[in-house]
Amino acid sequence: MDDKWNFINAEGQILSTQWFDWVGNFNEGLAKVGLNGQDNVINTDGQLISNQWFDGVQIFHEGFAIVELDGKWNFIDTEGQLLSKQWFDGAWIFYEGFAIVKLNGKFNFINPSGQILSQQWFNEAMAFQPKGFAIVKLNDKWNLINTEGQFVSNLWFDWIGDFNEKEGFAQVKLNGKWNFINAKGQLLSQRGFDWAWEFFYT
């Protein structure tokens, strides 16, 4: 209507008294809407969940959406509440209960309570895997961190691959040789190899 957008329900009722410049699809009971160059989120009752309009809003995943304001990043929950008092230089979606955040060129993880997982910030960080581990890089070496913020291995590696979900091993490179570690960070073999492939099944 007059280049404005809204939603209509199965009874033919217009969802919101507010008309928008653009609207997105509903996801997890919420939809992104835009007005005057800024974004917000509307629920199935036609209510905006936040009093704050943002420069950008991403889709909800695991109960949180990434929001951008003045070049900084945060998260909102399904009630429109900010997850953290800290705004970050970068933020990624929640996966397996944690989201990667970036601050001052370093990476860490944030949980659904808004707590930073580790006192140590990292040069690089990968998303948590279903096994409950995330790959992190510090000073050109790699390790695994668990959901308690503890390093899985006493060793730091030249490279770490993803955990194999069936066998529970991750491919690693240490001092130029290849090996595997288990979920406790222990090497599978006492010797290193010139090359090692991932586990295969027949």
Regions found by a protein language model. Give the residues of each.
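Residue-level detector of conserved, function-critical positions
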Residues: 1-202
